[in-house]
Amino acid sequence: VRIHLTTFLLGIALITGCTKTIQSPREALIEDDFAAKTFKTDKEGLSHLIALLKTVHGNIEIKFYSKESPNSVSKIVGLIKKGFYDGLKFHRVIPNFIIQTGDPTGTGRGGSGKLLKAEFNSIPHIKGTVALARGEGPDSSDSQFYIALTTLPHLDGKYTIIGQVVKGMEVVDKITKNDIIVSFSIKKK
C-alpha cells in the first residue's frame, strides 16, 4: 500500500509539474491598451500625462515621450495604473550613473513577464532621462526602468527612452539601494 501511495503521489507531482505555472498577481499584470500615440504633448515632445512616483525622500514627477516610444510608454503607464510598481525596491543604484527599479524580485532579473520590442530614438541621455533597462538583446526590455543621474552619451540610441523627470530631481539624487517606491500613479496636468 505504501508503494502504491508513493507511486500515486509521484505521478500527481509529475502531472502537476507539467502544467502551466500560475503567475503571481504581479507577474500576471498586463498593460491596458493605452493609446500613447494619442497623448497630447508639449513643444519638447513630452506628454501632458504626469507620473507621480512617491518615495520616502519625496516625490518625483515624470512626463513621457509618447510619440517616440508609444508601445513602451503604453506598457509602463498600464503597469503604473495597475499598481505594479507600488512597494518595489530601487534594486540598482550607481552614483553618478543611474538608479533602477521595476523588478518585483528585487534582483534585477524579474519583470512583468512580457518583453517589449525596442523603440530606440534620438533623444539624448541627460540628467533625469527615464529609459527602459534591458538584457543583452535589444528586444529584452520589460518593466524595469532607470533614471539617469547625469548625462550619459554612451547609452544614446542603445536603450528605449520613455520619459524625463520634470520635478523632483533632488529626490532622485537622494535614492539609495533598496529604497522603496511608496506609490506610483498617473495624474493629469
Label the model's feature ranges.
Residues 1-5:
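Positively charged n-region of N-terminal signal peptides that target proteins for export
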Residues 7-15:
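Bacterial N-terminal signal peptides
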Residues 17-189:
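Cyclophilin-like peptidyl-prolyl cis-trans isomerases
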